[in-house]
Swiss-Prot record:
Disulfide partners: 27-86
UniProt-recorded name of the protein: Ig lambda-1 chain C region
Domain Ig-like: 6-100
Coiled-coil parts of chain: none
Keywords: Disulfide bond, Immunoglobulin domain
């Protein structure tokens, strides 16, 4: 099976969740093969070391893999920073998706 680079999408926290003083960013990683990825999060360019969780890759119906990574913050922490990025490394190549909090208000 040929190698396949992942498609990466980064979603901001919902306004409903922010009202509960939580903020979860979701990074979806789909259509990659082989089924091994590394996910790194950055906030304002600084690597994040806590509050993140990445699922084990699972096989899709097309025999490629998918995974998700979550970064959980307090709403206050979300509001304190402006730039969030999810970096996915697969087979030595890195795909980075970023969002700016200003675009999400």
């Amino acid at each position: 099976q040929p190698k396949s680079s992942p498609s990466v999408t980064l979603f901001p926290p919902s306004s409903e969740e922010l009202e509960t003083n939580k903020a979860t960013l979701v990074c979806t990683i789909t259509d990659f093969y082989p089924g091994v990825v590394t996910v790194d999060w950055k906030v304002d360019g600084t690597p994040v070391t806590q509050g993140m969780e990445t699922t084990q890759p699972s096989k899709q119906s097309n025999n490629k893999y998918m995974a998700s990574s979550y970064l959980t913050l307090t709403a206050r922490a979300w509001e304190r920073h402006s730039s969030y990025s999810c970096q996915v490394t697969h087979e030595g190549h890195t795909v980075e998706k970023s969002l700016s909090r200003a675009d999400c208000s």
